[in-house]
Protein backbone atom coordinates (compact mmCIF):
# COMPACT_ATOMS: atom_id res chain seq x y z
CA UNK A 1 0.00 0.00 0.00
CA UNK A 2 1.35 3.40 -0.90
CA UNK A 3 1.13 4.67 2.64
CA UNK A 4 2.83 7.89 3.62
CA UNK A 5 5.05 7.40 6.68
CA UNK A 6 6.51 10.83 7.37
CA UNK A 7 7.19 10.77 11.09
CA UNK A 8 10.63 10.62 12.63
CA UNK A 9 8.89 10.73 16.00
CA UNK A 10 6.07 8.27 16.79
CA UNK A 11 3.11 10.61 16.92
CA UNK A 12 0.26 9.27 14.84
CA UNK A 13 -3.46 9.16 15.57
CA UNK A 14 -6.17 7.49 13.52
CA UNK A 15 -9.36 9.54 13.93
CA UNK A 16 -12.82 7.94 13.98
CA UNK A 17 -15.16 10.89 13.30
CA UNK A 18 -18.29 8.70 13.43
CA UNK A 19 -16.98 6.06 15.81
CA UNK A 20 -18.02 2.55 14.82
CA UNK A 21 -21.08 3.64 12.82
CA UNK A 22 -21.24 1.77 9.52
CA UNK A 23 -23.68 0.97 6.72
CA UNK A 24 -22.31 -2.57 6.40
CA UNK A 25 -22.37 -5.50 8.81
CA UNK A 26 -19.27 -7.42 7.76
CA UNK A 27 -19.22 -10.68 9.67
CA UNK A 28 -15.54 -10.42 10.58
CA UNK A 29 -15.47 -6.73 11.55
CA UNK A 30 -13.64 -6.19 14.82
CA UNK A 31 -14.85 -2.62 15.27
CA UNK A 32 -18.64 -2.75 15.04
CA UNK A 33 -18.99 -3.97 18.61
CA UNK A 34 -17.04 -1.00 19.97
CA UNK A 35 -20.37 0.87 20.01
CA UNK A 36 -21.08 -1.09 23.22
CA UNK A 37 -18.46 1.05 24.93
CA UNK A 38 -20.60 4.09 24.19
CA UNK A 39 -24.16 2.89 24.79
CA UNK A 40 -24.91 6.02 26.81
CA UNK A 41 -24.56 8.17 23.68
CA UNK A 42 -26.24 7.11 20.45
CA UNK A 43 -25.01 10.19 18.56
CA UNK A 44 -21.54 8.95 17.66
CA UNK A 45 -20.40 12.14 15.95
CA UNK A 46 -17.40 14.28 16.83
CA UNK A 47 -18.23 17.88 17.74
CA UNK A 48 -16.74 20.85 15.91
CA UNK A 49 -14.99 22.02 19.07
CA UNK A 50 -13.36 18.63 19.62
CA UNK A 51 -12.39 18.40 15.95
CA UNK A 52 -10.64 21.77 16.16
CA UNK A 53 -8.85 20.83 19.37
CA UNK A 54 -7.66 17.58 17.83
CA UNK A 55 -6.40 19.16 14.61
CA UNK A 56 -4.59 21.95 16.46
CA UNK A 57 -2.88 19.64 18.95
CA UNK A 58 -2.12 16.94 16.40
CA UNK A 59 -0.27 19.37 14.14
CA UNK A 60 1.57 20.96 17.05
CA UNK A 61 2.70 17.54 18.32
CA UNK A 62 4.53 16.63 15.10
CA UNK A 63 8.29 16.95 14.74
CA UNK A 64 8.50 16.99 10.94
CA UNK A 65 7.21 19.44 8.32
CA UNK A 66 4.77 16.87 6.90
CA UNK A 67 1.61 15.88 8.79
CA UNK A 68 -0.63 12.97 7.85
CA UNK A 69 -4.27 12.83 8.95
CA UNK A 70 -5.95 9.44 8.70
CA UNK A 71 -9.74 9.23 8.79
CA UNK A 72 -11.11 5.82 9.71
CA UNK A 73 -14.24 4.09 10.92
CA UNK A 74 -16.73 2.55 11.06
CA UNK A 75 -17.60 4.14 7.78
CA UNK A 76 -16.01 7.55 7.29
CA UNK A 77 -18.40 8.71 4.56
CA UNK A 78 -21.32 8.62 6.99
CA UNK A 79 -20.08 12.10 7.87
CA UNK A 80 -21.03 14.66 5.17
CA UNK A 81 -18.57 16.37 2.86
CA UNK A 82 -19.18 19.58 4.81
CA UNK A 83 -17.52 17.94 7.83
CA UNK A 84 -14.35 17.22 5.88
CA UNK A 85 -14.38 20.67 4.30
CA UNK A 86 -14.42 22.08 7.82
CA UNK A 87 -11.54 19.78 8.77
CA UNK A 88 -9.48 21.03 5.82
CA UNK A 89 -10.27 24.61 6.80
CA UNK A 90 -8.95 23.95 10.31
CA UNK A 91 -5.89 22.16 8.96
CA UNK A 92 -5.00 25.15 6.82
CA UNK A 93 -5.52 27.52 9.75
CA UNK A 94 -3.23 25.60 12.11
CA UNK A 95 -0.71 24.30 9.54
CA UNK A 96 1.75 27.17 10.02
CA UNK A 97 3.69 26.25 6.91
CA UNK A 98 3.55 22.49 7.33
CA UNK A 99 2.49 20.19 4.51
CA UNK A 100 -0.82 18.50 5.34
CA UNK A 101 -1.80 15.17 3.78
CA UNK A 102 -5.04 13.27 4.23
CA UNK A 103 -5.91 9.61 3.81
CA UNK A 104 -9.34 8.11 4.33
CA UNK A 105 -10.57 4.53 4.57
CA UNK A 106 -14.01 3.66 3.17
CA UNK A 107 -16.07 0.64 2.18
CA UNK A 108 -16.88 2.50 -1.04
CA UNK A 109 -20.67 2.19 -0.80
CA UNK A 110 -21.38 5.93 -0.54
CA UNK A 111 -18.87 7.11 -3.14
CA UNK A 112 -20.40 9.38 -5.78
CA UNK A 113 -19.19 12.07 -8.17
CA UNK A 114 -19.29 14.75 -5.48
CA UNK A 115 -17.16 12.75 -3.06
CA UNK A 116 -14.67 11.83 -5.78
CA UNK A 117 -14.33 15.42 -6.98
CA UNK A 118 -13.70 16.47 -3.39
CA UNK A 119 -11.02 13.83 -2.90
CA UNK A 120 -9.33 14.74 -6.18
CA UNK A 121 -9.40 18.48 -5.52
CA UNK A 122 -7.92 18.02 -2.05
CA UNK A 123 -5.40 15.26 -2.85
CA UNK A 124 -6.87 12.63 -0.54
CA UNK A 125 -5.43 9.13 -0.65
CA UNK A 126 -8.47 6.82 -0.51
CA UNK A 127 -8.29 3.32 0.89
CA UNK A 128 -11.10 1.04 -0.30
CA UNK A 129 -12.05 -2.12 1.56
CA UNK A 130 -12.68 -4.85 -1.01
CA UNK A 131 -12.09 -8.56 -0.58
CA UNK A 132 -11.37 -9.56 -4.15
CA UNK A 133 -13.83 -10.95 -6.74
CA UNK A 134 -17.56 -10.92 -6.06
CA UNK A 135 -17.76 -14.48 -4.72
CA UNK A 136 -15.10 -13.72 -2.11
CA UNK A 137 -16.15 -10.18 -1.28
CA UNK A 138 -19.84 -10.93 -0.75
CA UNK A 139 -19.20 -13.92 1.50
CA UNK A 140 -18.73 -11.70 4.55
CA UNK A 141 -19.17 -8.06 3.42
CA UNK A 142 -22.94 -7.56 3.52
CA UNK A 143 -25.30 -4.88 4.79
CA UNK A 144 -27.69 -5.03 7.76
CA UNK A 145 -30.32 -6.71 5.57
CA UNK A 146 -27.85 -9.39 4.53
CA UNK A 147 -27.56 -8.05 0.99
CA UNK A 148 -24.19 -8.21 -0.83
CA UNK A 149 -22.12 -5.09 -1.45
CA UNK A 150 -19.68 -5.97 -4.25
CA UNK A 151 -21.41 -4.17 -7.12
CA UNK A 152 -21.82 -0.99 -5.07
CA UNK A 153 -18.13 -1.02 -4.17
CA UNK A 154 -17.13 -1.53 -7.80
CA UNK A 155 -19.29 1.43 -8.83
CA UNK A 156 -17.40 3.50 -6.28
CA UNK A 157 -14.04 2.32 -7.60
CA UNK A 158 -15.11 3.17 -11.15
CA UNK A 159 -15.90 6.70 -9.96
CA UNK A 160 -12.53 7.04 -8.23
CA UNK A 161 -10.85 6.04 -11.48
CA UNK A 162 -13.09 8.36 -13.50
CA UNK A 163 -12.00 11.35 -11.40
CA UNK A 164 -8.35 10.33 -11.18
CA UNK A 165 -8.38 9.84 -7.41
CA UNK A 166 -5.40 7.97 -5.97
CA UNK A 167 -6.69 4.88 -4.20
CA UNK A 168 -5.41 1.70 -2.59
CA UNK A 169 -7.10 -1.57 -1.68
CA UNK A 170 -7.38 -3.11 1.75
CA UNK A 171 -8.32 -6.77 1.41
CA UNK A 172 -9.09 -9.07 4.31
CA UNK A 173 -7.77 -12.61 3.93
CA UNK A 174 -10.09 -15.08 5.64
CA UNK A 175 -10.91 -18.78 5.74
CA UNK A 176 -12.97 -18.53 2.54
CA UNK A 177 -10.75 -16.60 0.12
CA UNK A 178 -7.31 -17.64 1.37
CA UNK A 179 -7.32 -20.80 -0.74
CA UNK A 180 -7.53 -18.81 -4.00
CA UNK A 181 -4.53 -16.46 -3.89
CA UNK A 182 -4.04 -16.05 -7.65
CA UNK A 183 -7.73 -15.38 -8.29
CA UNK A 184 -7.44 -12.77 -5.56
CA UNK A 185 -4.29 -11.15 -6.91
CA UNK A 186 -5.33 -11.21 -10.57
CA UNK A 187 -8.59 -9.47 -9.68
CA UNK A 188 -6.75 -6.47 -8.26
CA UNK A 189 -4.50 -6.29 -11.30
CA UNK A 190 -7.53 -6.43 -13.59
CA UNK A 191 -9.21 -3.47 -11.88
CA UNK A 192 -6.00 -1.43 -12.04
CA UNK A 193 -5.16 -1.44 -8.34
CA UNK A 194 -1.41 -1.04 -7.90
CA UNK A 195 -1.24 -0.74 -4.12
CA UNK A 196 -2.65 -3.60 -2.08
CA UNK A 197 -2.74 -4.33 1.63
CA UNK A 198 -3.57 -7.93 2.50
CA UNK A 199 -4.75 -8.26 6.10
CA UNK A 200 -5.19 -11.68 7.72
CA UNK A 201 -8.27 -11.91 9.91
CA UNK A 202 -7.82 -13.70 13.23
CA UNK A 203 -10.44 -13.23 15.95
CA UNK A 204 -11.46 -15.10 19.09
CA UNK A 205 -14.71 -15.05 21.05
CA UNK A 206 -14.50 -14.48 24.81
CA UNK A 207 -16.79 -13.36 27.64
CA UNK A 208 -16.12 -9.89 29.00
CA UNK A 209 -17.95 -7.80 31.57
CA UNK A 210 -17.97 -4.73 29.29
CA UNK A 211 -20.12 -6.49 26.67
CA UNK A 212 -17.34 -6.89 24.11
CA UNK A 213 -16.95 -10.39 22.67
CA UNK A 214 -13.69 -10.26 20.70
CA UNK A 215 -10.51 -11.05 22.60
CA UNK A 216 -7.63 -8.57 22.94
CA UNK A 217 -4.15 -9.76 22.14
CA UNK A 218 -1.49 -11.26 24.41
CA UNK A 219 -4.13 -13.26 26.29
CA UNK A 220 -4.76 -16.96 25.86
CA UNK A 221 -8.15 -18.59 25.61
CA UNK A 222 -11.32 -17.96 23.69
CA UNK A 223 -12.88 -19.74 20.76
CA UNK A 224 -11.40 -19.04 17.34
CA UNK A 225 -13.99 -17.63 14.94
CA UNK A 226 -14.94 -19.70 11.90
CA UNK A 227 -13.89 -16.94 9.50
CA UNK A 228 -10.30 -16.75 10.80
CA UNK A 229 -7.56 -17.70 8.37
CA UNK A 230 -5.25 -20.53 9.44
CA UNK A 231 -1.48 -20.15 9.65
CA UNK A 232 -1.06 -22.68 6.87
CA UNK A 233 -3.51 -20.86 4.62
CA UNK A 234 -1.76 -17.55 5.28
CA UNK A 235 1.66 -18.95 4.45
CA UNK A 236 0.50 -20.61 1.24
CA UNK A 237 -1.42 -17.46 0.25
CA UNK A 238 1.62 -15.21 0.63
CA UNK A 239 4.06 -17.58 -1.07
CA UNK A 240 1.81 -18.11 -4.08
CA UNK A 241 1.22 -14.41 -4.67
CA UNK A 242 4.87 -13.60 -4.05
CA UNK A 243 5.95 -16.04 -6.77
CA UNK A 244 3.74 -14.27 -9.29
CA UNK A 245 4.77 -10.82 -8.11
CA UNK A 246 8.52 -11.43 -7.96
CA UNK A 247 8.64 -12.80 -11.51
CA UNK A 248 6.36 -10.27 -13.19
CA UNK A 249 5.29 -7.28 -11.09
CA UNK A 250 8.12 -5.84 -8.98
CA UNK A 251 8.07 -2.07 -9.38
CA UNK A 252 4.63 -2.15 -11.00
CA UNK A 253 2.41 -3.47 -8.21
CA UNK A 254 3.07 -2.78 -4.56
CA UNK A 255 2.01 -5.20 -1.84
CA UNK A 256 2.45 -3.72 1.60
CA UNK A 257 3.74 -6.85 3.32
CA UNK A 258 6.32 -7.51 0.61
CA UNK A 259 7.58 -3.93 0.86
CA UNK A 260 7.74 -4.17 4.65
CA UNK A 261 9.62 -7.47 4.46
CA UNK A 262 12.20 -5.97 2.12
CA UNK A 263 12.55 -2.96 4.43
CA UNK A 264 13.30 -5.22 7.39
CA UNK A 265 15.71 -7.23 5.24
CA UNK A 266 17.58 -4.04 4.40
CA UNK A 267 17.44 -2.81 7.98
CA UNK A 268 15.19 0.23 7.64
CA UNK A 269 11.85 0.97 9.28
CA UNK A 270 9.16 -1.18 7.62
CA UNK A 271 6.49 1.54 7.61
CA UNK A 272 3.83 -0.66 9.23
CA UNK A 273 3.63 -1.25 12.96
CA UNK A 274 2.83 -4.97 12.70
CA UNK A 275 6.29 -5.74 11.30
CA UNK A 276 8.24 -3.23 13.41
CA UNK A 277 10.29 -4.05 16.51
CA UNK A 278 8.03 -1.89 18.64
CA UNK A 279 4.48 -0.71 18.10
CA UNK A 280 2.45 1.95 19.85
CA UNK A 281 3.25 4.80 17.47
CA UNK A 282 -0.26 4.64 15.97
CA UNK A 283 -3.03 5.52 18.40
CA UNK A 284 -6.76 5.89 17.86
CA UNK A 285 -9.18 8.64 18.84
CA UNK A 286 -12.89 7.95 19.10
CA UNK A 287 -15.58 10.49 18.26
CA UNK A 288 -15.83 11.66 21.91
CA UNK A 289 -12.10 12.27 22.38
CA UNK A 290 -11.17 8.94 23.98
CA UNK A 291 -7.68 7.92 22.90
CA UNK A 292 -6.56 4.28 22.80
CA UNK A 293 -3.18 2.64 22.32
CA UNK A 294 -4.04 1.02 18.97
CA UNK A 295 -6.93 0.36 16.59
CA UNK A 296 -6.84 -3.32 17.59
CA UNK A 297 -6.71 -2.51 21.30
CA UNK A 298 -9.79 -0.34 21.74
CA UNK A 299 -10.63 -1.79 25.14
CA UNK A 300 -11.12 0.04 28.45
CA UNK A 301 -7.82 -1.34 29.77
CA UNK A 302 -5.97 0.29 26.87
CA UNK A 303 -7.60 3.71 27.07
CA UNK A 304 -4.97 6.43 27.48
CA UNK A 305 -7.34 9.23 28.38
CA UNK A 306 -9.60 11.80 26.78
CA UNK A 307 -8.68 14.85 24.74
CA UNK A 308 -10.79 17.05 27.01
CA UNK A 309 -8.48 16.30 29.97
CA UNK A 310 -5.12 15.54 28.33
CA UNK A 311 -3.20 16.67 25.29
CA UNK A 312 -2.40 14.30 22.45
CA UNK A 313 1.27 14.62 23.24
CA UNK A 314 0.73 13.71 26.89
CA UNK A 315 -1.30 10.61 26.06
CA UNK A 316 0.88 9.29 23.24
CA UNK A 317 4.05 9.87 25.28
CA UNK A 318 2.65 8.57 28.55
CA UNK A 319 4.27 5.75 30.49
CA UNK A 320 1.27 3.56 29.65
CA UNK A 321 1.79 4.01 25.94
CA UNK A 322 5.53 3.53 26.23
CA UNK A 323 4.93 0.27 28.10
CA UNK A 324 2.47 -0.79 25.40
CA UNK A 325 5.04 -0.01 22.73
CA UNK A 326 7.79 -2.01 24.43
CA UNK A 327 5.47 -4.93 25.21
CA UNK A 328 5.81 -6.26 21.68
CA UNK A 329 9.53 -6.93 22.03
CA UNK A 330 9.64 -7.52 25.78
CA UNK A 331 7.13 -10.38 25.68
CA UNK A 332 8.60 -12.26 22.73
CA UNK A 333 8.69 -15.97 23.63
CA UNK A 334 11.90 -18.00 23.47
CA UNK A 335 11.02 -19.53 20.10
CA UNK A 336 10.89 -16.04 18.56
CA UNK A 337 14.18 -14.99 20.14
CA UNK A 338 15.88 -18.03 18.61
CA UNK A 339 14.23 -17.63 15.19
CA UNK A 340 16.47 -16.65 12.27
CA UNK A 341 13.62 -14.50 10.92
CA UNK A 342 12.88 -12.54 14.08
CA UNK A 343 14.22 -9.43 12.35
CA UNK A 344 11.63 -9.83 9.59
CA UNK A 345 8.45 -9.81 11.67
CA UNK A 346 9.36 -9.12 15.33
CA UNK A 347 6.51 -11.38 16.37
CA UNK A 348 4.00 -9.52 14.17
CA UNK A 349 0.96 -7.88 15.79
CA UNK A 350 0.51 -8.51 19.55
CA UNK A 351 -3.18 -8.96 18.80
CA UNK A 352 -2.39 -12.34 17.20
CA UNK A 353 0.04 -13.57 19.85
CA UNK A 354 -2.05 -15.95 21.94
CA UNK A 355 -0.64 -19.46 21.48
CA UNK A 356 2.33 -21.17 23.14
CA UNK A 357 5.71 -21.71 21.56
CA UNK A 358 7.58 -25.01 21.24
CA UNK A 359 8.89 -24.58 24.78
CA UNK A 360 5.46 -24.04 26.26
CA UNK A 361 5.91 -20.29 26.69
CA UNK A 362 2.96 -17.94 26.01
CA UNK A 363 2.97 -15.19 23.41
CA UNK A 364 3.64 -16.95 20.12
CA UNK A 365 1.84 -15.56 17.10
CA UNK A 366 -1.04 -17.70 15.86
CA UNK A 367 0.20 -17.08 12.29
CA UNK A 368 3.85 -17.90 13.08
CA UNK A 369 4.00 -21.07 11.00
CA UNK A 370 2.67 -19.21 7.96
CA UNK A 371 5.07 -16.29 8.35
CA UNK A 372 8.03 -18.65 8.82
CA UNK A 373 7.06 -20.47 5.63
CA UNK A 374 6.85 -17.15 3.79
CA UNK A 375 10.19 -15.77 5.02
CA UNK A 376 11.99 -19.02 4.22
CA UNK A 377 10.44 -18.99 0.75
CA UNK A 378 11.34 -15.38 -0.10
CA UNK A 379 14.80 -15.27 1.52
CA UNK A 380 16.90 -15.66 -1.67
CA UNK A 381 14.84 -13.02 -3.47
CA UNK A 382 15.06 -10.62 -0.54
CA UNK A 383 18.82 -11.16 -0.33
CA UNK A 384 19.13 -10.30 -4.02
CA UNK A 385 16.92 -7.20 -3.80
CA UNK A 386 18.79 -6.03 -0.71
CA UNK A 387 22.06 -6.26 -2.63
CA UNK A 388 20.57 -4.33 -5.55
CA UNK A 389 19.41 -1.53 -3.26
CA UNK A 390 22.76 -1.36 -1.49
CA UNK A 391 24.42 -0.96 -4.89
CA UNK A 392 21.92 1.67 -5.99
CA UNK A 393 20.26 -0.58 -8.54
CA UNK A 394 16.50 -1.17 -8.83
CA UNK A 395 15.22 -4.20 -6.90
CA UNK A 396 13.04 -4.95 -9.94
CA UNK A 397 16.17 -6.55 -11.41
CA UNK A 398 15.14 -9.60 -9.41
CA UNK A 399 12.67 -10.43 -12.18
CA UNK A 400 15.59 -11.26 -14.48
CA UNK A 401 17.08 -13.77 -12.07
CA UNK A 402 16.45 -17.49 -11.70
CA UNK A 403 16.62 -19.02 -8.25
CA UNK A 404 16.80 -22.72 -7.61
CA UNK A 405 14.48 -24.30 -5.12
Task: Please place each PLM-identified region on the residue numbering.
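Conserved alpha-helical substructure of the radical SAM core
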Residues: 1-117, 121-122
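Long, charge-rich, low-complexity alpha-helical segments
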Residues: 1-5, 186, 338
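Disulfide-bonded cysteines in secreted/extracellular proteins and peptides
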Residues: 22, 26-29, 273, 279, ...
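Conserved AdoMet/S-adenosylmethionine-binding subsite of the radical SAM
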Residues: 55-56, 78-197, 204-206
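Radical SAM enzyme [4Fe-4S]-AdoMet core and its adjacent flexible, acidic
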Residues: 143-151, 158, 162-274, 278, ...
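Short, ordered coil/turn segments that flank beta-strands lining enzyme active or ligand-binding pockets
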Residues: 287
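Flexible mid-to-C-terminal extensions adjoining Fe-S/redox cofactors in radical SAM and related proteins
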Residues: 298-405
Amino acid sequence: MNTIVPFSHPMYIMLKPAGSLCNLRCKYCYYLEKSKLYDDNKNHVITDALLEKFIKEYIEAQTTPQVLFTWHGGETLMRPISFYRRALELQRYYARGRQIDNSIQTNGILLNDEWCRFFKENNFLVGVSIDGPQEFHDEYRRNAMGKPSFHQVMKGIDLLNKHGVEWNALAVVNDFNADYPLDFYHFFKEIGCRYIQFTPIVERIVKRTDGLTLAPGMQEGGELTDFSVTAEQWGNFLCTIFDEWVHHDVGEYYIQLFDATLANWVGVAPGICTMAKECGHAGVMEYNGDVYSCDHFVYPEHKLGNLSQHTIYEMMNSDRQKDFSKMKYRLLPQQCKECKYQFACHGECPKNRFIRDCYGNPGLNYLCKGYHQFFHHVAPYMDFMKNELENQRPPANVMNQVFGK
